[in-house]
Every structure is written in C-alpha cells, then in structure tokens.
Amino acid sequence: MKLTMDKIDGMLIACLQGVVNSANAEQLEAELAAQVDKGERRVVLDLGRLDYISSAGLRVVLLVAKQLRQVQGELVLCELKPHVREVFEISGFLSIFPVANSREAAAAAFKTALPR
C-alpha cells in the first residue's frame, strides 16, 4: 500500500494505491487518525488506484469516519474502481458513505461549509 496526502481547498485528499489488508491496515489507520488529530475535518479517500481492500481495510474506513464524526468532520470516498466498489457495496458501506466519481464531485459532496 502506498498512501499520499495532499491538502486542496480545505480538504485532505488521501490517495490509496495498491492493496490494503491486515498487513498494513494498522499503519493506514495511524496515519489517517493522526491527520484528524491535527485538525483535518474534511477527508477524501481517493481509491482510484486501489487494487484491493480487505475487511481490515474496511474497518479502518469505519474507524476514521467515526473519528471524524466525533469532531463534526466528514469522509467522502471517490474514484472507486468497479471491483473495489463491489466490496464496498457488498459490505453495505455504499449506504453509509458519500461516494463521488471525482475529487471535484467529492468536494461538492461535503455537507458542511468550509470555515472562513
């Protein structure tokens, strides 16, 4: 798994590449949780380069979303490949999280206004 993060227009874009599984889920959780602890409130998970996500990876998504909700933050998923989207659909996650086709659409999916 490779994780790159960029701050764009008040959003943290976390781009996952490769495979998220039990071998690296803990690292991913720590890195994303640290960003929320530092004050990030709008997080976009760009999954366009993600090849596979296991149940351990899905757990991380849930935990980060919960952490964000506790601080009035939001999580939006974007650019899911068909086979990754299927995993999220089967798990019921598509009914829990906003999903966008692009980063631009993800920005529009946030419910709260950006702080001024």
Curated annotation (Swiss-Prot):
Changing residue 55 to D: Absence of BtrW-catalyzed phosphorylation; binds BtrW 2-fold more than wild-type. The keyword Phosphoprotein applies. Residues 1-110 form the STAS domain. GO terms for molecular function: anti-sigma factor antagonist activity. InterPro entries: Anti-sigma_ant (IPR003658), STAS_dom (IPR002645), STAS_dom_sf (IPR036513). It holds the Pfam family STAS. Keywords: Phosphoprotein. It comes from the Bacteria. Phosphorylated by BtrW. Dephosphorylated by BtrU. The modification Phosphoserine is found at residue 55. Type III secreted proteins Bsp22 and BopD accumulate intracellularly instead of being secreted in cells expressing the mutagenized BtrV. NCBIfam families: ant_ant_sig. Possible positive regulator of sigma-B activity. Non-phosphorylated BtrV binds to BtrW, preventing its association with an unknown partner(s) that might be sigma-B. When phosphorylated, releases BtrW, which is then free to complex with and inactivate its partner. Involved in type III secretion system (T3SS). PANTHER family: ANTI-SIGMA FACTOR ANTAGONIST TM_1081-RELATED (PTHR33495:SF2), ANTI-SIGMA FACTOR ANTAGONIST TM_1081-RELATED-RELATED (PTHR33495). Belongs to the anti-sigma-factor antagonist family. Interacts with BtrW. This is Putative anti-sigma factor antagonist BtrV. The gene is btrV.
